From Swiss-Prot:
Superkingdom in the source lineage: Eukaryota
Assembly and interaction partners: Component of the cytochrome c oxidase (complex IV, CIV), a multisubunit enzyme composed of 14 subunits. The complex is composed of a catalytic core of 3 subunits MT-CO1, MT-CO2 and MT-CO3, encoded in the mitochondrial DNA, and 11 supernumerary subunits COX4I, COX5A, COX5B, COX6A, COX6B, COX6C, COX7A, COX7B, COX7C, COX8 and NDUFA4, which are encoded in the nuclear genome.
Lineage of the organism: Eukaryota, Metazoa, Chordata, Craniata, Vertebrata
Any one cellular-component term (Gene Ontology): mitochondrial inner membrane
Membrane topology note: Multi-pass membrane protein
UniProt-recorded name of the protein: Cytochrome c oxidase subunit 2
Reaction catalysed by this enzyme: 4 Fe(II)-[cytochrome c] + O2 + 8 H(+)(in) = 4 Fe(III)-[cytochrome c] + 2 H2O + 4 H(+)(out)
Protein location: Mitochondrion inner membrane
Length: 227
């Protein structure tokens, strides 16, 4: 989860988030090299009086600055397209959870079970227990099995919302009348926090998301106790 004065991304918890962080580093390296080259050339132009009168007419230079940007864009686009396909691909999910956004709470329905559904509201600051996080705790957590593919169906009952859990690399728009889907796969157990990431009204900041990833045996025990 995030912490005060954090400079980097949250620790990756899913394969998709790991790929996104690798892509971020890959792209940042390319941008850094280009920026360094541009700054070096600018500094040379400002500090020296050297000129090359035939530069603008050189066929070789024109060829280089046409082909090189195209190659750089391809180097950025190919990993990006690969990750986009990964995010859209859902292979044999073991569980489907339907998530509905409301003003201003989330409701969840485990569609593989007959009567397993609940609403999830933020816990007010006055009701927090020692060690709990302000504006991030909920009264009903979403309990899911770890290391298994889970399909999340996301929609909304009223206005636009966005269901986002950064450490899992998830951000899916909740649009009234439309179902969007995302894949949830956690590499380890734990609590993972998120929030609504689409301005949806006066209490937009009070729509936290808490996923509790547990081993499959614990999930089966929890689901049996909820039915």
């Amino acid at each position: 989860m995030a912490y005060s004065f954090q400079l980097g991304l949250q620790d990756a918890t899913s394969p998709i988030m790991e790929e996104l962080m690798n892509f971020h580093d890959h792209t940042l390296m390319i941008v850094f090299l280009i920026s360094s080259l541009v700054l070096y050339i600018i500094s040379l132009m400002l500090t020296t009086k050297l000129t090359h009168t035939s530069t603008m007419d050189a066929q070789e230079v024109e060829t280089i600055w046409t082909i090189l940007p195209a190659v750089i864009l391809i180097m950025i686009a190919l990993p990006s397209l690969r990750i986009l396909y990964m995010m859209d691909e859902i292979n044999n999910p073991v569980l489907t959870v339907k998530t509905m956004g409301h003003q201003w709470y989330w409701s969840y329905e485990y569609t593989d079970y007959e009567d397993l559904c609940f609403d999830s509201y933020m816990i007010p600051t006055n009701d927090l227990k020692p060690g709990e996080l302000r504006l991030l705790e909920v009264d009903n957590r979403v309990v899911l099995p770890m290391e298994l593919p889970i399909r999340m169906l996301v929609s909304s009952e009223d206005v636009l919302h966005s269901w986002a859990v950064p450490s899992l690399g998830l951000k899916t728009d909740a649009i009234p009348g439309r179902l969007n889907q995302a894949t949830v796969t956690s590499n380890r157990p734990g609590l993972f926090y998120g929030q609504c990431s689409e301005i949806c009204g006066s209490n937009h900041s009070f729509m936290p998301i808490v996923l509790e990833m547990v081993p499959l045996k614990h999930f089966e025990n929890w689901s049996a106790s909820m039915i």
